[in-house]
């Protein structure tokens, strides 16, 4: 079964709080919510102008708050860049703390990724060697806490399918999986559909993001990732790709979550969720193959 979640980051550009995102999730009849975390304290979050959650928060209280609102955490976004030396210095500890927090609130997965730019002064071979050791340390915690570590397509390494494959093969572990982002793979100049076909067996979670014509014209092939999109899902130039991806998932009998990434206004959220629910409800002919499980 394919279900819907949404990322609280949709409210960051609106200076919206975590509570604002939770209210929207209830309003639009969602059962799941994804959120980013802050390692320590952030005055923006403390003042209520950020939808992130501090890792210093009481996780049990947060879990009760979500349950009281009929919600479960689908994924914790721990997207500080894991690649290279800064990943070793800051990203590993950040991901490990996110794993602990996820386990405490009953969230089955965290999200990790590479940076927007390649580390200066390092060859790709050096970066990959460091990154492999970073994931080795993270996966030790993932295995003990039984929390999946997803690798998201976001930066120059993960939006290159050959490099992404190498990273997913760092270790033969069921705890290292893929979070495919339809918007980032498209902006990077690739095809979300081809990414999905190639990596379906590794797919654990998906960020669904459409792209406006203006944004595509300005950034496609020049950037590798966008945080969210001002375009409602189904109304941008990536809509056909998203529709094809959903069809592939349904044919493969994939079981998992699609997380909505769009501007968190009622108008855009409503249009995005209506379009996605229409795609999920559309008839399909299942392929004669066993289902992919998350």
Region annotations inferred by a language model:
Residues 20-24, 59-68, 72-73, 82-178, ...:
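Active-site acidic/histidine proton-transfer and metal-coordination neighborhood
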Residues 1-32, 67-69, 158-294:
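Histidine-acidic metal/acid-base catalytic patches
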Residues 1-8, 72-81, 114-118, 224:
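N-terminal small/glycine-rich loop or linker at the start of catalytic domains
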Residues 35-40, 78, 112-115, 154, ...:
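Active-site loop/turn elements of alpha/beta-hydrolase fold enzymes
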Residues 17, 46-51, 85-90, 121-126, ...:
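Short, solvent-exposed loop/turn segments at secondary-structure boundaries
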Residues 34, 75-77, 111, 150, ...:
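Conserved beta-strand positions in the central sheet of alpha/beta enzyme cores
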Residues 34-61, 115-122:
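Glycine-rich, proline-tolerant flexible connector loops at the mouths of alpha/beta enzymes
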Residues 10, 49-53, 80-89, 231-236:
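The substrate-binding groove and active-site-proximal loops of carbohydrate-active enzymes
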């Amino acid at each position: 079964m394919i279900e819907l979640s949404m990322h609280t980051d949709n409210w960051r550009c609106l200076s919206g709080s975590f509570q604002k995102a939770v209210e929207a999730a209830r309003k639009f009849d969602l059962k799941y919510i994804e959120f980013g975390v802050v390692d320590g304290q952030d005055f923006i979050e403390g003042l209520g102008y950020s939808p992130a959650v501090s890792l210093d928060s009481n996780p049990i209280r947060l879990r009760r708050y979500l349950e009281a609102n009929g919600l479960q955490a689908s994924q914790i976004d721990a997207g500080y860049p894991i690649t290279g030396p800064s990943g070793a210095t800051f990203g590993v500890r950040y991901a490990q703390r996110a794993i602990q927090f996820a386990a405490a609130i009953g969230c089955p997965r965290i999200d990790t990724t590479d940076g927007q730019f390649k580390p200066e002064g390092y060859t790709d071979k050096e970066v990959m060697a460091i990154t492999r050791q970073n994931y080795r340390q993270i996966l030790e915690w993932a295995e003990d806490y039984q929390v999946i570590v997803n690798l998201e397509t976001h930066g120059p390494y993960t939006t290159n399918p050959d490099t992404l494959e190498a990273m997913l093969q760092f270790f033969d572990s069921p705890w290292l999986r893929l979070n495919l982002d339809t918007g980032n793979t498209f902006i990077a100049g690739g095809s979300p559909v081809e990414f999905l076909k190639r990596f379906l067996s590794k797919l654990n979670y998906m960020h669904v993001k459409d792209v406006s014509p203006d944004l595509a014209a300005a950034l496609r092939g020049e950037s590798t990732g966008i945080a969210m999109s001002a375009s409602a899902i189904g109304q941008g130039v990536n809509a056909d790709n998203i529709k094809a991806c959903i069809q592939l998932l349904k044919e493969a009998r994939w079981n998992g979550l699609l997380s909505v990434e769009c501007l968190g206004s009622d108008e855009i959220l409503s249009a995005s969720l209506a379009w996605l629910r229409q795609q999920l409800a559309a008839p399909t002919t299942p392929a004669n193959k066993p289902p992919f499980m998350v």
